[in-house]
Amino acid sequence: EALYAPFARSRDKMIVMDVRSAEMTKYAANCMLATKISFINEVANICERVGADVGAVRRGIGADHRIGHHFIYPGMGYGGSCFPKDVKALITTARDSGYDPELIAAVDAVNHRQKQVLGRKIADYFAGRGGLDGRVLALWGLAFKANTDDMREAASLEIIRELTAAGMAVKAFDPVAGSRARRLLGDHPRVRICESQYEPLEGADALAIVTDWNQFRNPDFGRIRKLLKIPAIFDGRNLYDAELAAGMGFDYFSIGRAAAAPSREKST
């Protein structure tokens, strides 16, 4: 305590415990946060099937002070260097100790499945349009979250792997992670890392949003529609209002909300 005293003026923020408990605290904290993420994603997937809006559900449960709004944003699952590693480490530690951590294992399994959700929506959409082979996807976002270039365990990698294996080409842009992406994916024959936000859309068949960068939140929808061959947006971060997107002529798909499409009725 004396060693840390100059750096810990608020005594309530410093807790002294044994080494094993300290290690367990670190793992448990990250697993708790990961659990909240997997939980809201599980709820989002149920919402889609029963006609509920996960955004409304999130606001409702978050209003309960015992739950709060932190870490209950539906999307593409967690990634990066901490949550995946610590969740897996606690699962392994538990099993090595003779205990089956069913809940934590489910958190990991749900997260892995969530990274495939957007890719499946894209595959389903094009299934009735001749399939994915020869199609081009514009991808916004490569990092596992905004404000970093970290692509470890990023959902973008799972989407790229799945769709390119089915014959789709991917043109991607990320404001920060471009250089890292070139090192990871530069030799991939079906992947091109672009230099600017709208470059991937030129001649693409659809747009997918994977990372919630601020610059993706208010794009030029008219420009997007003009550049895309098919006006389809797959929003893995729920950045846009579904009715607004449909009103501008887009087929719009998000997480935990009903798909939206422009009216096909002819005006009189």
Model-derived segments and their meaning:
Residues 1-268:
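Structural/interface elements that position substrates and couple domains in central-metabolism enzymes
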